[in-house]
UniProtKB/Swiss-Prot annotation:
PROSITE patterns: COA_TRANSF_1, COA_TRANSF_2. It catalyses: a 3-oxo acid + succinyl-CoA = a 3-oxoacyl-CoA + succinate; acetoacetate + succinyl-CoA = acetoacetyl-CoA + succinate. The modification N6-succinyllysine is found at K185, K418, K421, K455. Pathway: Ketone metabolism; succinyl-CoA degradation; acetoacetyl-CoA from succinyl-CoA: step 1/1. GO terms for molecular function: identical protein binding; succinyl-CoA:3-oxo-acid CoA-transferase activity. The gene is Oxct1. GO terms for cellular component: mitochondrion. NCBIfam families: pcaI_scoA_fam (TIGR02429), pcaJ_scoB_fam (TIGR02428). It comes from Mus musculus. Its EC number is 2.8.3.5. This is Succinyl-CoA:3-ketoacid coenzyme A transferase 1, mitochondrial. Keywords: Lipid metabolism, Mitochondrion, Phosphoprotein, Transferase, Transit peptide. Belongs to the 3-oxoacid CoA-transferase family. SUPFAM superfamilies: NagB/RpiA/CoA transferase-like. Key enzyme for ketone body catabolism. Catalyzes the first, rate-limiting step of ketone body utilization in extrahepatic tissues, by transferring coenzyme A (CoA) from a donor thiolester species (succinyl-CoA) to an acceptor carboxylate (acetoacetate), and produces acetoacetyl-CoA. Acetoacetyl-CoA is further metabolized by acetoacetyl-CoA thiolase into two acetyl-CoA molecules which enter the citric acid cycle for energy production.
Amino acid sequence: MAALKLLSSGLRLGASARSSRGALHKGCVCYFSVSTRHHTKFYTDPVEAVKDIPNGATLLVGGFGLCGIPENLIGALLKTGVKDLTAVSNNAGVDNFGLGLLLRSKQIKRMISSYVGENAEFERQFLSGELEVELTPQGTLAERIRAGGAGVPAFYTSTGYGTLVQEGGSPIKYNKDGSVAIASKPREVREFNGQHFILEEAITGDFALVKAWKADRAGNVIFRKSARNFNLPMCKAAGTTVVEVEEIVDIGSFAPEDIHIPKIYVHRLIKGEKYEKRIERLSLRKEGDGKGKSGKPGGDVRERIIKRAALEFEDGMYANLGIGIPLLASNFISPNMTVHLQSENGVLGLGPYPLKDEADADLINAGKETVTVLPGASFFSSDESFAMIRGGHVNLTMLGAMQVSKYGDLANWMIPGKMVKGMGGAMDLVSSSKTKVVVTMEHSAKGNAHKIMEKCTLPLTGKQCVNRIITEKGVFDVDKKNGLTLIELWEGLTVDDIKKSTGCDFAVSPNLMPMQQIST
């Protein structure tokens, strides 16, 4: 009772001191603030919630693919007709949904994103000079937003060193004739403990448009499954944060320790009128199929690579797998082995594809495919995910490539002026020296063009980052100083065959063995 009286007294004292703007009484150590300066404002009409967004504003727009996007708020912007927007978002949805709608209506002037993906209109506008696009590594984008919300003006990261991100010159805007009108600027470089890092500046927005699952009437917010992604850091990095939710509950419905975003970051709240929650890539398994498939292996060549790649897994390992061959290799993980699969959109403990009635729009992998999770799995935000990746907590990264150099340089994200998919999370995934990087790819491109080369001719994803190359013809180990060593060779091929199809010289291991295949 004495403690309650003291608390009550402190509250009165705090209120009195604040209202009079005077000093606290001598001898008082602290007081409880009861300021009413900021309250979350609730809306019923999404247009009302965004109508004051002016032309030329910078918007932070949450979501990953179509998962966790603020559908109702994007629809409201279509109605207000606001123009010349700078949209900061991991990607731009698809042609006819998500931010793709604002691209089609020509309301966006510049995108700051990591991935163009399958949005053909996004790519068309960029390559034709209609849209400015600042492509940024996914983890760097997440950290720039996190830093902006935390009041950190800039930070150093190893991601992007030795690439166009560091060197500058990456096209931001094309002229109609295909020449570069605006190019990215070089980054400052510093060395710490013998490793190179580049300086990245924080990102803040005028407004953040965020999708969450539930909010209470105080303004506290929680997310659902992998729909957390970029939504969480964006909540904290804007002058005005507008959150749309599926349900609003009474104060006290959430345990304090379960709240993902405290009310201090939330300025406006609205319950979305309706949600389509479209699934970009519905991937399913059938009853009795323990893993499920993301497409077919694609014949002997791909299956050969997949079955060799599966031997890279070790019990207890944390691994991040790219779409295509790397992800298909996970189908061959032994049931006697535990491999923890991490997905950069915020999942640790990926399981098989869902049955038809298990598919969930709020649970996808980095390839935007529907997935399930295993017991012991966890969900987290994009900035947290890339802290795991950049910090070297992931043991293995397996991904595809367009080109790999003799000394382990990797190129897999763009063909200037022709094809721009964006680097996504790849630059971050290969940035940690603590993580083993394995490239899986066909040995040659169309027309038997070399993919393993003396020097990459395409823009780099990472410099001297690849540790091993697996193709249908053999396996190479990569040394940053000494180059390639052929350690495994497919049955029926000779070393001379490999020399003819490889665009650089390589050593041959004295212990050269037949190319291994996992038993099935």
